[in-house]
Amino acid sequence: MDASMMAGLDGLPEEDKAKMASMIDQLQLRDSLRMYNSLVERCFVDCVDSFTRKSLQKQEETCVMRCAEKFLKHTMRVGMRFAELNQNAPTQD
């Protein structure tokens, strides 16, 4: 968990901070695994169509690489956009 998230927990007792940090870490891990599984499924379905060999054909391998790069670039762009929106959002104090 990063420092900006911990700053929001300043008013809590240490035990509650630890519980919240653990919960946030679990949620981040779950989301990372979900994103990975989504990437694998999408690229496999879109790119792999021959099951005559145990390894990918060159065109399938190229397709998977492009698919993964596109997915990750899109995910990074969405994350950057959310960060921009969060920076510009008014805070409630």
Curated annotation (Swiss-Prot):
One of its GO terms (cellular component) is mitochondrial intermembrane space. GO terms for biological process: mitochondrion organization; protein transport. Keywords: Chaperone, Disulfide bond, Metal-binding, Mitochondrion, Protein transport, Translocation, Transport, Zinc. It holds the Pfam family zf-Tim10_DDP. A motif (Twin CX3C motif) lies at residues 43-67. It is found in: Mitochondrion intermembrane space. Coiled coil: none annotated. Disulfide bonds join 43-67, 47-63. The keyword Glycoprotein does not apply. GO terms for molecular function: metal ion binding. Expressed in roots, flowers, young cotyledons and leaves. Belongs to the small Tim family. Heterohexamer; composed of 3 copies of TIM9 and 3 copies of TIM10, named soluble 70 kDa complex. The complex associates with the TIM22 component of the TIM22 complex. Interacts with multi-pass transmembrane proteins in transit. The twin CX3C motif contains 4 conserved Cys residues that form 2 disulfide bonds in the mitochondrial intermembrane space. However, during the transit of TIM9 from cytoplasm into mitochondrion, the Cys residues probably coordinate zinc, thereby preventing folding and allowing its transfer across mitochondrial outer membrane. Mitochondrial intermembrane chaperone that participates in the import and insertion of multi-pass transmembrane proteins into the mitochondrial inner membrane. May also be required for the transfer of beta-barrel precursors from the TOM complex to the sorting and assembly machinery (SAM complex) of the outer membrane. Acts as a chaperone-like protein that protects the hydrophobic precursors from aggregation and guide them through the mitochondrial intermembrane space. This is Mitochondrial import inner membrane translocase subunit TIM9. The lineage of its organism: Eukaryota, Viridiplantae, Streptophyta, Embryophyta, Tracheophyta. The gene is TIM9.
